[in-house]
């Protein structure tokens, strides 16, 4: 995925 905290939040 693209770099970014928001993206990481969805993954978890």
Curated annotation (Swiss-Prot):
It comes from the Eukaryota. One of its GO terms (cellular component) is extracellular space. Its main location: secreted. One of its GO terms (molecular function) is oxygen carrier activity. Keywords: Copper, Oxygen transport, Secreted, Transport. The keyword Transport applies. It is found in: Secreted, Extracellular space. Hemolymph. Hemocyanins are copper-containing oxygen carriers occurring freely dissolved in the hemolymph of many mollusks and arthropods. Belongs to the tyrosinase family. Hemocyanin subfamily. This is Hemocyanin subunit 2. The lineage of its organism: Eukaryota, Metazoa, Ecdysozoa, Arthropoda, Crustacea.
């Amino acid at each position: 995925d693209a770099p970014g905290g928001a993206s990481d939040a969805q993954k978890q």
